[in-house]
Amino acid sequence: MGLSVSKLLNGLFGKKEMRILMVGLDAAGKTTILYKLKLGEIVTTIPTIGFNVETVEYKNISFTVWDVGGQDKIRPLWRHYFQNTQGIIFVVDSNDRERITEAREELQRMLSEDELRDALLLVFANKQDLPNAMNAAEITDKLGLHSLRQRSWYIQAACATSGDGLYEGLEWLSANLKRKSP
């Protein structure tokens, strides 16, 4: 009896877990975001060859965040991380107007994968502190987010170095994870 009550309470109040895949073009700020969330500070990063994985605790949810390198040569490896992914964080360098079309193509390619059909999509429009940065509405348009019909998505203006917008993004993920949970 006591065990079943504790199981019930744990189900109601226990820690939920969410597997997150964080991707985007190279130099978008994925690793900086990961360690700003994990450590609360800016770390010096080098281009990610392979992946970084960290657990980030937020509002009784344990987010396991897989930060996968974004160079064009290693993007085909992203698919190896798709299984059991509940949420995708797609990071865009808001200042990189030359590559926004490339970002859109990579995002659309990934979202067409069957293994990710139920995954939530959070887009971080990163580097909002730069003077020429595209705002969230412009990035929404350029990525074609309004055409996504069967997917929950959200775009959040962010600045990885200051932390602006990062927790608002996690807030959206946590609220929508709870909505999808049984």
From Swiss-Prot:
The keyword Manganese does not apply. Keywords: ER-Golgi transport, Golgi apparatus, GTP-binding, Lipoprotein, Myristate, Nucleotide-binding, Protein transport, Transport. Transmembrane segments: none annotated. One of its GO terms (cellular component) is cytoplasm. It holds the Pfam family Arf. SMART domains: ARF, RAB, SAR. It is found in: Golgi apparatus. It comes from the Eukaryota. A lipid is attached at residue 2 (N-myristoyl glycine). One of its GO terms (biological process) is intracellular protein transport. One of its GO terms (molecular function) is GTP binding. GTP-binding protein involved in protein trafficking; may modulate vesicle budding and uncoating within the Golgi apparatus. This is ADP-ribosylation factor. It comes from Cryptococcus neoformans var. neoformans serotype D (strain JEC21 / ATCC MYA-565) (Filobasidiella neoformans).
